[in-house]
Amino acid sequence: MTRMVMLQGTGSDVGKTVLVAGLCRLARLHGRVVRPFKPQNMSNNAAVADDGGEIGRAQWLQALACGVPSSVHMNPVLLKPQSETGSQIIVQGRVFGQAKGRDYQRLKPQLLGAVLDSFEELKAGADLVIVEGAGSPAEINLRAGDIANMGFATRANVPVVLVGDIDRGGVIASLVGTHAILPEEDRRMISGYIINKFRGDQSLFADGIGAITQYTGWPSFGIVPWLKAAGRLPPEDSVALERLSRSSTGALKIAVPVLSRIANFDDFDPLASEPSVDLVYVRPGEPLPADAALVILPGSKATIGDLADLRAQGWDKDLTLHRRRGGRIIGICGGYQMLGNSVADPLGLEGAPCRVEGLGLLEIDTEMAPEKTVRNSAAHSLEYDMALSGYEIHLGQTDGPDCQRPALTIRGRADGAISADGKVMGTYLHGLFGNDEYRAALLQSFGISNGTVNYRQSVEQALDDLARELESVLDKAWLDQLIG
């Protein structure tokens, strides 16, 4: 019989994703066939699963931790925010439609069937399935029709472990308050709790553990400190991105403006792992640093809206000055589209039908089209003459004079563009910098020739270290019962 557990949180960003990844790797190290599952995720950081279709990149990472191919069934409902109130809905890897918050609440009961079907698909042949909730089950205003937390757990009969984040303060109130506010049907699904992100002497919190157990009746399954290995894994979403800071003496400064609907920003994690690179995320209200040698425009879930926001920040002027100073610019996917002369959306796929002026840094034009390209891709760098791997997730077609100088070929067709002076380049290929050989060639073009890290190997090692850290601090009896 397949074992199951679901990690839910007292709030968002309490560390569920990392804990699930670590437990998945730990089970794998113990020889178990384990798979991750997240019924509903909200993120513009998407991956192309090995069986085709989009899932959250967190679930892609968790599949890597399990040592199994990623599948659309690992994240059957993915919400990709396009505005403050609306999202694109991906169901089992495919576009289902778009909806604003209130409309989506009405849609959720229709999606439960797909969620349960995907869960059954994953359970087949697995020793263990580790499920990750979303947000908090204490958001009882969202309980009706819920598919992300207790609504799923009660229907699928999956025991729940509640995760509380002590670093943000108030963890006792968060756990006890969750117990108090949940209906009895949901409370009885919870088998225990984990305190996450602890700093300092754990013995000082012994009375806190006693108080939580006294008020809730739940046992503690362990106190998890700040995990060193977690810092070597890609952050899941822009909430984590806002807190990222990097103090580096790297010789090469690379700037990435944080767009409102930034997507797939884990494209840049391989660059951040390089000792010779000082990767700077530029927040709204900050200028692009004048001493950056390279500026990379990231992907976006709303190219036209983010282009307007970019101008509102004055980053368009910063980019023009950067190029005049001899700096280089790379655009990835939506960032590539912004670099051109125009972006047209005649069907209103991102909002009202319109055509807007681009940054004019590449002689190209883009028109949005309803057919979405979603695929893993083998590619070839024309600039450095080397094989690449990556993935595509985009709407629209791009053409123009600079496309006659393509950056890559993808599946044998030309992709991207390079300016006449060679200073500006764009491509639709995500995952470009994850290719170690390409990253080394790029750094060498800036005079950095001291080698690069093996990025995939570094992530695998971080997952191993994470698993061992968790094994040393979590309750042994609980782990034995879970993993066997």
From Swiss-Prot:
PANTHER family: COBYRIC ACID SYNTHASE, DETHIOBIOTIN SYNTHETASE. It comes from Allorhizobium ampelinum (strain ATCC BAA-846 / DSM 112012 / S4) (Agrobacterium vitis (strain S4)). Coiled coil: none annotated. Keywords: Cobalamin biosynthesis, Glutamine amidotransferase. This is Cobyric acid synthase. Residues 251-438 form the GATase cobBQ-type domain. GO terms for biological process: cobalamin biosynthetic process. NCBIfam families: cobQ, PRK00784.1. Pathway: Cofactor biosynthesis; adenosylcobalamin biosynthesis. Catalyzes amidations at positions B, D, E, and G on adenosylcobyrinic A,C-diamide. NH(2) groups are provided by glutamine, and one molecule of ATP is hydrogenolyzed for each amidation. The active site is at C333 (nucleophile), H430. The gene is cobQ. One of its GO terms (molecular function) is ABC-type vitamin B12 transporter activity. The keyword Transferase does not apply. The keyword Ribonucleoprotein does not apply. Belongs to the CobB/CobQ family. CobQ subfamily. The lineage of its organism: Bacteria, Pseudomonadati, Pseudomonadota, Alphaproteobacteria, Hyphomicrobiales. CDD domains: CobQ_N (cd05389), GATase1_CobQ (cd01750). Pfam families: CbiA, GATase_3. SUPFAM superfamilies: Class I glutamine amidotransferase-like (SSF52317), P-loop containing nucleoside triphosphate hydrolases (SSF52540).
